[in-house]
């Protein structure tokens, strides 16, 4: 007595339908509405708690996806990459931070006279200096500085007119590259690359979300299929046992040879082995789904049976193959990431070409000077006969009134003869751009092939139901 053929047809149809669901996760958009996923390290909304009833975890596909997006550890790792990429942009923008510099110096000297013009047999002098400066990189590649310099000098020389004397000065300094490292593109190369890397990190997050959705759906339907295969195996075992009992009755009445009992016993053993394998597959599918959902290593959660509640439903592809390929090429994050990487390499190649130019820098300085102090009136022998008080405020007033000015303009030039290092780096950068372009074309072809094969598989599976 053979098992009912209708059961086989039903089993084949159900298994094909589940397989069709798995293929659809690769070929077709899984849902009409976009899924919104937070990229923050601490997502604002948590997934709904697990529904545990009768010692089993009851789970729909939507609940599984929500849990995975909220708790999956690999997705959390990618969130850290995004946070680091944002900080890297802030670090790159730091090139435009103002730099404050300052200093204070005190000194005292005692020097024996080397000439009558020293004004004392032992010349004694005390100095004090204070500087404060502010500098910043310019988008053009140059640097601008403002320096405020102050000093105090006191000596025992009889030739000094201002004693103590105070000096103050305001210096405006500009250093501007004219060829190499000139321009916004060269200056902000690191900023643009950091922003592109942030976009690459975002695309990696999108890619991981996409992969996770596919993995969860595959894991969910694999569990559904494994549980169904277990049910089929159990039904087959029950049928084999009933067949064995029927054969036993027929042997007892003499209408069947005893050898048939041995064959039916072998059938029972085979079905029992299939059940062992089916239960093994169910356990593996449950553990894989638990891992994707990021469940805590709680013994109760990992021991509880997972009962999937969603039913397998699928519709035929709505898009023609060529439109599906075009949509994939426009939306696949790995391709967008590859294109952004190529743009980074193009920026690097442009900067390397700039490094082939000579170093020509324009240096310009504009100064405002002032001096003040006690004015001493001396007799012919150098002794002080009168004095007029003065101080640092006199020097500051002269600077503010623009009384004493000065300026300097110059050009600096440097160029390594041969420039082999820069030429080799530029050639390597150009090759990297060409390589990235080829890899991009390869990925486009791979995506198009993958979509065609996936759509064909879905259509074939749909016809097989």
Q: At which residue positions do the language-model features occur?
A:
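Small/polar, glycine/serine/threonine/aspartate-rich low-complexity segments that form flexible
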Residues: 50-56, 104-172, 307-317, 350, ...
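A glycine-/polar-enriched beta->alpha junction
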Residues: 67-76, 83-98, 131-164, 172-190, ...
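Periplasmic alpha-helical coiled-coil/stalk elements that build and connect Gram-negative outer-membrane
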Residues: 3, 92, 202-324, 457-464
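Regulatory alphaC helix of protein kinase catalytic domains
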Residues: 43-67
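Amphipathic alpha-helical coiled-coil segments
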Residues: 77-92, 208-232, 242, 249, ...
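N-terminal secretory signal peptides that target proteins for export/translocation
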Residues: 1-11
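Amphipathic alpha-helical coiled-coil scaffold segments and their short linker/junction regions
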Residues: 68, 179, 256, 260-265, ...
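Bacterial N-terminal signal peptides
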Residues: 14-27
